[in-house]
């Protein structure tokens, strides 16, 4: 492995580490990573001098946000993604509601069925969208100035055979 790929490796390691920290730290309402699946899916691959960052599919939506069908969070205004005709399936929120310990009650004080709660959450997300967290974008952009000199030096050393 050349100096260029070593520098890319350091850069990619830093970005993934910071993205995982952002997921664990979360935001105003707690962790963005209740199950740990997204965090454990974050990785990178270096191939022919290019870095590819990998994650579960929904990582993109959590990072960039999704515009809602009726309204949009200010953080998600620039998102390329938007709910138009279909709601997210309510079943995907089942494990999340259990781990979150959410157990709301109706007007008579009875617990709402989990299936109904999952539907209400899915409908709210469909209407309002998903707030952009920038858990990956921020470390990706912040790391460039930190590692650009190392990456450039590594590239020049590997390709121009510079002697010091």
Language-model regions, residue ranges each:
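Charge-rich, low-complexity N-terminal segments
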Residues: 1-45
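Charged, low-complexity interaction tracts
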Residues: 37-164
């Amino acid at each position: 492995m050349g100096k260029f790929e070593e520098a890319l490796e350091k850069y990619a390691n830093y970005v993934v580490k910071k993205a995982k920290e952002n997921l664990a730290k979360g935001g105003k309402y707690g962790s963005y990573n209740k199950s740990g699946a997204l965090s454990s899916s974050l990785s990178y691959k270096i191939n022919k001098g290019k870095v590819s960052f990998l994650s579960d599919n929904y990582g993109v939506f959590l990072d960039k946000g999704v515009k809602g069908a009726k309204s949009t969070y200010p953080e998600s205004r620039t998102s390329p993604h938007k709910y138009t005709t279909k709601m997210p399936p309510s079943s995907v929120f089942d494990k999340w509601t259990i781990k979150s310990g959410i157990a709301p009650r109706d007007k008579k004080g009875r617990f709402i069925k989990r299936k109904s709660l999952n539907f209400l959450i899915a409908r709210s997300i469909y209407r309002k969208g998903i707030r952009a967290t920038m858990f990956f974008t921020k470390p990706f952009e912040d790391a460039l100035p930190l590692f650009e000199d190392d990456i450039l030096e590594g590239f020049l050393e590997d390709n121009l055979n510079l002697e010091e």
